[in-house]
Amino acid sequence: MAKKTYDLLFKLLLIGDSGVGKTCVLFRFSDDAFNTTFISTIEIDFKIKTVELQGKKIKLQIWDTAGQERFHTITTSYYRGAMGIMLVYDITNGKSFENISKWLRNIDQHANEDVERMLLRNKCDMDHKRVVPKGKGEQIAREHRIRFFETSAKANINIEKAFLTLPEDILRKTPVKEPNSENVDISSGGGVTGWKSKCC
């Protein structure tokens, strides 16, 4: 039997409208790569990265979910078992910020009650095209008592910091049991098709 190379397994989700840059954020953290064109995620795909925090090796299983409204029924089952969720909006897209409230309601309905949440104000390198003031994001974060980060996958701003802070908060919040790998289904998110979309 192969020796397990990690102490804990955390399932994290990236949630938000299509085109806000979730895939770019994920690839910047997992592969330290940035591409202006990715295939828009129709179902769900995930990346694995192991980090060391508080003396423990933690395997992060990070799921990139479809943002389109019509695919919410597909992603609902993936909330189950998530220990941390990053909500992402695009500072150049006012609708993506308005929909954060809907995503928060989705989390309340489908995720574990004690799931750790974080709000990302993405594409902060495009501040000259900003339509969502920073203060609005800070306000909604305060109202829901969640962390708030300004991020940019393109400029590599706060990506690693956000992805390390979320599991740190999970570690502090609850005593975490070591996972049974047999209970973790990583096969159902492999089917990805789609079209090209811009993200930062």
UniProtKB/Swiss-Prot annotation:
Pfam families: Ras (PF00071). It is a lipid-anchor. Mg(2+) binds at residues 23, 41, 64. Highest levels in neural and muscle tissues. Its EC number is 3.6.5.2. There is a cross-link at residues 102, 136, 154 (Glycyl lysine isopeptide (Lys-Gly) (interchain with G-Cter in ubiquitin)). The keyword NADP does not apply. The modification Phosphothreonine is found at residue 73. Keywords: Acetylation, Cell projection, Cytoplasm, Cytoplasmic vesicle, Endoplasmic reticulum, Endosome, Golgi apparatus, GTP-binding, Hydrolase, Isopeptide bond, Lipoprotein, Lysosome, Magnesium, Membrane, Metal-binding, Nucleotide-binding, Phosphoprotein, Prenylation, Protein transport, Transport, Ubl conjugation. Phosphorylation of Thr-73 in the switch II region by LRRK2 prevents the association of RAB regulatory proteins, including CHM and RAB GDP dissociation inhibitors GDI1 and GDI2. Phosphorylation of Thr-73 by LRRK2 is stimulated by RAB29 and RAB32. Phosphorylation by LRRK2 is required for localization to stressed lysosomes. InterPro entries: P-loop_NTPase, Small_GTP-bd, Small_GTPase, Small_GTPase_Rab. A lipid is attached at residues 199-200 (S-geranylgeranyl cysteine). GTP binds at residues 18-24, 35-36, 40-41, 67, 122-123, 125-126, 152-154. It comes from the Eukaryota. The modification N6-acetyllysine is found at residue 102. Its cofactor is Mg(2+). GO terms for biological process: antigen processing and presentation; axonogenesis; cellular response to antibiotic; cellular response to insulin stimulus; endoplasmic reticulum tubular network organization; endosomal transport; establishment of neuroblast polarity; establishment of protein localization to endoplasmic reticulum membrane. A motif (Switch 1) lies at residues 32-46. Belongs to the small GTPase superfamily. Rab family. Interacts with MYO5A; mediates the transport to the plasma membrane of SLC2A4/GLUT4 storage vesicles. Interacts with GDI1 and with GDI2; negatively regulates RAB10 association with membranes and activation. Interacts (GDP-bound form) with LLGL1; the interaction is direct and promotes RAB10 association with membranes and activation through competition with the Rab inhibitor GDI1. Interacts with EXOC4; probably associates with the exocyst. This is Ras-related protein Rab-10. It comes from Rattus norvegicus (Rat). The lineage of its organism: Eukaryota, Metazoa, Chordata, Craniata, Vertebrata. The gene is Rab10.
